[in-house]
């Protein structure tokens, strides 16, 4: 029964991430591509102009002048990357993230979001394993304060498979505690 429930949840998750009727090139809430946005170009020109105004106050080969020249180059490169990436900009000229599930915008939000969830899951799974292991030692509180580095490294190196291990423990019943093992505080 638990396997069927897990399979059903995975199917629901997959279909919610992959919408069938997504339209690829529909404008979203009045947003335009940054390279076509006059406000984006104006913002670039204003940023470069401010830096060039500051640059005019210094002699040519002084450290502040070199730092400002480098900052001007980096600003132009940053704006150029936004323009080439296809990210959409608003009327203010600022890039906006589209989080509606379309795959052509996956690089903006979904991929970093999934990566964030994977890394936080890794940290939680490794910490859980370490705490469960040290709870069986004679001084668990001491090992929470002063880490047992070899043991912690063992869990860190094996933590990258945490999604598979979590599914295995969920289907075998190890992940979820019984109701009788959970204390209820009297009120």
Curated annotation (Swiss-Prot):
Cross-referenced SUPFAM superfamilies: Subunit III of photosystem I reaction centre, PsaF
Q: Which GO terms describe its cellular component?
A: chloroplast thylakoid membrane; photosystem I reaction center
Q: Name the membrane topology term.
A: Single-pass membrane protein
What span is annotated as the signal peptide, if there is one? 1-24
Disulfide connectivity for this sequence is none
Q: Which Pfam families match?
A: PSI_PsaF
Q: Which GO terms describe its biological process?
A: photosynthesis
UniProt keywords, alphabetically: Chloroplast, Membrane, Photosynthesis, Photosystem I, Plastid, Signal, Thylakoid, Transmembrane, Transmembrane helix
Q: Where are the transmembrane segments?
A: 106-126
Q: Which domain of life is it from?
A: Eukaryota
> Where does it localize?
Plastid, Chloroplast thylakoid membrane
Regarding protein family, the annotation reads:
Belongs to the PsaF family.
Tell me the function of this protein: Probably participates in efficiency of electron transfer from plastocyanin to P700 (or cytochrome c553 in algae and cyanobacteria). This plastocyanin-docking protein contributes to the specific association of plastocyanin to PSI.
The protein in question is named Photosystem I reaction center subunit III
Please name the gene that encodes this protein.
psaF
